[in-house]
Every structure is written in structure tokens, then in C-alpha cells.
Amino acid sequence: MKTVLSTIWAKAGGKYALIVIGAWLLVSALSLVWTPYSLLDTNGFNAWASPSAAHPLGTDGTGADVLSWLMAGSRTNLMIAVLTVIVAAVIGLLLVAAMVSRSGALASTSVVVVDALISIPTVLIALILSVPFGASAAVVIAACGCAYGLNLARILRPSALLAARSAYVESALWSGASSVRVFFTHIVPNTLPVLCVQLSMSAGTSLLAEAGLTYLGVGVGAGVPSWGHSLSTSVKFISVYPMAVLWPGLVVTMVVVALNLFGDALRDAIDPLTNPALREAA
């Protein structure tokens, strides 16, 4: 683990990613116990105030402190990103296991199902889920997790199929190892470089999706702090006070870029093809 982190830190993009992601985690933890102002602390007479010592990032249309809402929103967005990655990984790996199954019927059926479902937009999935469940973070997580899981399965299939047909997998199966054990000990490790990149991209894309879905009214619920909520409530007043849109937009952009760079750096750190130290160790 220490070697992986040092390899990531050695890259310029990796430094940026670790610093930004580390700051995100710290702010999320800090917001559990402290924010400059209560989220319910509003003052209509102080709406759209410019940045000042009292309000470093200014206030929004209700007079609420923008920094406090962004700090509290970081916690919501962290939850969405982490849970989306978990859901996408579970769905993606289950589908990959079916797609490389030694049962030809199961494998071919899984490929057809993935190809058919992957064409459904994330927004449509969210709209369908919002009908019975309403707008919530759970809808964002479920919609993004399903959509990204399907995409993950299709991307991982070639490398997983190559590993499944290798001699060492055949030997493991002939020696009596179960298909589940072979999948997780021999096939999944061969997909790790691609898996890491795709999951980090899924985390970043989920933040963009949350902002878009919240703007459409099917994202996080009203009154729930999130970066998408801060954007959606202030974008209509961009001509009045552009700074209210600038801050959440800047935060989302910085974190999404950091997650993508982290995925690239992590792939380079754990892939023997790009890390000479791993080739020498092998």
C-alpha cells in the first residue's frame, strides 16, 4: 500500500489527486461536527452578499452561507460517490462472471442483456425510479450504479475473458478449485488496472450526474445539502450573482478531475506493464 501511494505521489497528477481527495475527506469529516454557520441560518437582508471575512464565499439567495452549504454538501457527495462505486462494482463483476461463464448459454445471454440495457440513459433510469421513491440520493446512487455497472461489465469482459481462457485458470479448475474462487483469485486480479480506472471515473461521473439530476428535480431532495443542490438553486440567478454558481461548479470540477487523475495514477502504479518495479518483483 505504501509503495502504491508513493508511486502515485511521484506523478504530478497523482499529487493533485491525493491533495484534493484528501481535502475532500477532511472537509466531509469536519462538517459532521462544525460548519461556519447553521444551514438553517438565513437572512433575506443579506442575500447574494459578496465574499467577506464573515462569509468567505459569500451568501446565496436566502442569505445562507455558501461555504457552510458546500462543506455539508461534500458529505452527501462523498456518500453518493462511494456507494455508486460499490453498486457499480457489484453489478459489473456479477455480470462479468456471467459473461465469462463456462456455460455458453449463460455467457451469450448475459452479453445480449448487457448490450440491450446499456443503451438506457442514466436520466431515464432516475426518472423511472423517482416515480415510486421520489427525489433522493438513493435514486441517484441506484441509477448511476446500474448504468455504470453495465458499462463496467462491457469494458472488463475482454480482459476477463482472456484470463478465463488462460492455462493457469484451466489448471486451477482441474485441481478442484470452485468457479467462484477462480473468478476472484485469478480473473478479477487481471482486470484490476482497468477496474480501478473505470471505478474512479464512475465516482467522478456520479458527481456530475448528481448535479444534473438534482437540477432536473430527480436528484437529492429539497433541503438536502449537496453540490448539485447548490448549483441548481443558484444557476437561475447567475445574472444576479455569478459567484454563487462559481463556487460549487469549481468544487465539482476540481474533485472530478482529481478522481480521474487518481484512477490513471493508480492504474500505472498497479499495472506491471507501466510499473517497472512490479515487473522486476515478478
Residue ranges, per PLM feature:
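Hydrophobic alpha-helical transmembrane segments of polytopic membrane proteins
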Residues: 126-127, 131, 200, 215, ...
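N-terminal signal-anchor/first transmembrane alpha helix
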Residues: 1-37, 113, 191
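Membrane-cytosol interface at the C-terminal ends of specific transmembrane alpha-helices
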Residues: 85, 93, 97, 134-185, ...
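Generic hydrophobic transmembrane alpha-helix motif, especially the helices
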Residues: 56, 60, 101-162
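Transmembrane-helix boundary motif in ABC transporter permease subunits
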Residues: 31-34, 80-115, 127
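Short cytosolic juxtamembrane segments of multi-pass membrane proteins
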Residues: 261-282
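Non-cytoplasmic
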Residues: 127, 132, 136, 140-141, ...
